[in-house]
């Protein structure tokens, strides 16, 4: 299901559908946010591959530098600040994938709307552990492409709202620039709980994604085709 939760739903029905969406996803019926059709398809693929609940998150939120310095640096391997990001959505992640959960209201929408019509989010920090961050997408001329990256959700409190977690992916900064931005990917990424890159790679090949269009997070020292070798 790819529903128009933002910004139209709450003004028509008097509540936000985040919690309902999370319940459907928990039952194996993936629901994407903001009419993200390829996001819903990516979630479905992840559900089948992982045989588990998945989620869909915004990937364009950074981890505050002070939080990184206090709670992450030197405590979880060699992750740099650029390797981390806040995976966030209003409240669509299933309760079984949250460390604790609570029904709340959509704080961003409530800045301009009555709180009573923004009720319906399911909020909490996402469970720590291994994840696969991935997406299938089409270009404007109907050419399909995809990306896959292994990483983890860190066991660090986000101190924020929504369904949210602190994600760490090796060389995420370079991956973000040379795959996500250069590939014109939207700001939503699907998340499977575990490492499923090997299977996802074969699935993407099977459905016709050219191997050169399957992006992944290159290890340090392995250059992206457009990466400046002198940088």
Q: How would you label these PLM feature ranges?
A:
Residues 2-15, 69-70:
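Hard-cation-handling environments
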Residues 2-3, 55-58, 214-215:
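General beta-strand structural signal in soluble alpha/beta enzymes
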Residues 9, 46-53, 204-211:
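Structural signal for hydrophobic packing residues in well-ordered secondary-structure cores
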Residues 13-31:
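A short, gly/pro- and small-residue-rich
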Residues 16, 20, 45, 200-203:
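Generic structural signal of hydrophobic/aromatic residues within well-ordered alpha-helices
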Residues 19-23, 74-78, 209-214:
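Short, low-complexity, polar/charged sequence segments that are solvent-exposed and flexible
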Residues 25-161:
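C-terminal catalytic subdomain
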Residues 106-231:
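Extended hydrophobic packing segments that form well-structured cores
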